[in-house]
Structures are given as C-alpha cells and as structure tokens.
Amino acid sequence: TPEKVGRLMHAIYNYQGSLVVRSALQIMALTFCRTTEIRCAEWQEFDFEDNIWRIPAERMKMRRDHLVPLSRQALAVLEKLRAYSGGNQYVFPSYRSETIPFGRTALQRAIRRMGFEKDEMCPHGFRAMASTLLNELGYNRDWIERQLAHAPTEQIRGIYNRAEYLSERRRMLQNWADYLDGLRAKARQEVDLE
C-alpha cells in the first residue's frame, strides 16, 4: 500500500547505517534496478550532463544495454555519494575495500535492521512495488516494463518493439520520485504525531 511505501521510504532516508547502503537503497527505490546492477554500478556509467545511467549489456540480465533516466532526487543521492566514493571505480564500494562493491547481503540486512520482515520487503521487492504502484497510477505498461529492463512477453512484439521510451520514462521517473517524496513526508508526519 502507499502507506507502507511511505513508511519504508521514511525508514530508508533515516537509516543510521552506512552511507553507501542507505544511498543504494534510495537509488534502488528511485530507479527499480536489480540488486546486482546497483551493487556493481561504476562511476563511468553515469552521464551527469544527460542525467542518465548507461548500464552495459554485460551487466544486464537480458544482455542488452539499459538506459536509466535519473530524477532530481537520484542525482542528489549520487552527488552526496560522489564526495565519498567519486574517486573509486564503484559507486557503492565495500567498507572493507574501495576496489570491490559492497556485499551481496548488505541491503537485505539493512532492510531487516529497519524493522521490515522478509514477507514485507526484500531488495527485489522495490521492483514489484514500483511496477504495481505505477500500473495503479495509470502509467503505460511498456514504459514500466522497459524501465524494469524486462523482455516483452509476446515474442513478436519483442522482435519489433525496440523503443526505449526515454523521454516518457524520464517524466515517469521524476513523477515517481516526487510521489515517493510525498509518501515519505506523510509517513514522517505520522511518526511525528506518535
């Protein structure tokens, strides 16, 4: 529900653990990229003039380059992180070594530490959450599926439709980020009233 999403976003933005893990969770919520795409993100993949993240095919499940538009909120998270890890290869380095990405279980552990059980939220759940809410909000299914980097379900459609829907996805992701901010603000008010 939107209320649960608001509580989740409030918990993420107030997470007292590592800056890298908090930032990774924020980017995951804002872009709904897969855990490995986030963990192994490299600074060279980001174009801050075009506000786009170009994930190379070899890092994608479908083995196809993926363009991820970056909202103002995602850019703000990345700017904060750039002061911390900008000189490294990885955007989200391990606290043990700057030359490797953070651990595979770090996001899961952080979500548990914030009080969310396995049946409530897991890292992959950000993708389902975004898809569900964006569909309920009336966004075009093709835009959502392209943002999720899913292969089209109809084989013929997949062969012929190679559209990126970049300007539409850019608008959708900015609206999504604003929507999440609104849900988080509402959750913060509820916490303040308790």
Describe the residue ranges of each PLM region.
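Short, contiguous acidic/charged loop-to-helix segments that flank catalytic cores in large enzymes
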Residues: I12-Q16, A57-L67, P93-T99, E117-G125, ...
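C-terminal catalytic core of tyrosine-transesterase DNA break-rejoin enzymes
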Residues: Q26-E37, G125-A151
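Short, polar N-cap/turn motifs at the start of nucleic acid-interacting alpha helices
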Residues: E45-I52, K118-E120, L137-N161, G182-R188
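Residues in the recognition helix of alpha-helical DNA-binding motifs
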Residues: A41, A110, Q147
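Active-site/catalytic core of tyrosine-dependent DNA strand-transfer enzymes
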Residues: T1-G6, D50, P69-D119, M129, ...
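Basic, Lys/Arg- and aromatic-enriched nucleic-acid-binding interface segment
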Residues: T1-A41, E49, M60-R64, Y84-S85, ...
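Conserved tyrosine-mediated DNA breakage-rejoining catalytic core shared by Y-recombinases
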Residues: T31, T36, C40-A83, A151-G158
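C-terminal secondary-structure termini that scaffold catalytic or DNA-interacting sites
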Residues: K61, R72-A76, K80-N88, P93-T99, ...
